[in-house]
């Protein structure tokens, strides 16, 4: 019986510690990752804005639903293998150089935007830089994102998947 009480006490202490650490972390973060591709900005733009084809090259997206346009710009919902849905809307569209997409569900434990910047390089390649301006409202999720998931993991996966789409090896840059 004493052992069970000690175990319960340790578990509660761990939960409190995670809560305190998560509460002390900033709710907002900015993270950036980039990669170069041997493609034109127009080619990359065509792929990253054709959300209906995301499941063909992004392994974590199983299907996509079109949603009504918001302010004349595209909006869609992505589903993962667990059928979790994330709605997105475009907030900036400057073809083929700059795109900004926002998570469009205020009830999620996180929010934010991804800014995609495509820059042609002298050698004919294109640099794609993604900047995430994110907010994590839930302190437990904030703790997990900081210590276990990494703020840049999704961007890195996205850039690697894009490289695979083009049959290119992707070197991730800060």
Label the predicted regions.
Residues 43-48, 54, 90, 99-101, ...:
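Hydrophobic pocket/interface hotspot
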Residues 37, 41, 47, 57, ...:
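Solvent-exposed, acidic/flexible segments
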Residues 103-157, 162-164, 168, 173-174:
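Beta-strand/loop substructures that line and gate deep hydrophobic ligand-binding cavities in soluble
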Residues 2-20, 24, 81-125, 133-136:
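Hydrophobic-ligand binding "helix-grip"
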Residues 52-87, 96-98:
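Short beta-edge strand/loop motif at the mouth of beta-sheet-based domains
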Residues 48-58, 80, 159, 163-166, ...:
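Sec/Tat-exported extracytoplasmic proteins
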Residues 2-69:
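Hydrophobic ligand-binding cavity/cleft-lining segments
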Residues 41, 48-51, 87, 115, ...:
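Extracytoplasmic/secreted envelope proteins and their assembly/folding machinery
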């Amino acid at each position: 019986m004493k052992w069970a009480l000690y175990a319960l006490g340790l578990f509660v202490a761990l939960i409190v510690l995670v809560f305190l650490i998560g509460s002390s972390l900033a709710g907002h973060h900015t993270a950036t990752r980039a990669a170069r591709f041997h493609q034109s900005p127009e080619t990359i733009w065509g792929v990253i804005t054709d959300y209906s084809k995301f499941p063909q090259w992004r392994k974590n997206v199983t299907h996509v639903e079109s949603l009504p346009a918001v302010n004349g710009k595209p909006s869609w919902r992505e589903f993962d293998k667990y059928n979790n849905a994330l709605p997105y809307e475009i907030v900036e569209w400057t073809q083929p150089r700059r795109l900004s997409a926002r998570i469009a569900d205020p009830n999620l434990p996180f929010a934010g935007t991804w800014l995609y910047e495509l820059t042609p390089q002298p050698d004919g390649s294109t640099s794609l830089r993604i900047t995430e301006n994110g907010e994590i409202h839930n302190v437990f999720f904030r703790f997990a994102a900081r210590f276990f998931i990494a703020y840049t993991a999704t961007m890195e996966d996205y850039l690697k998947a894009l490289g695979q789409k083009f049959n290119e090896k992707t070197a991730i840059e800060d």
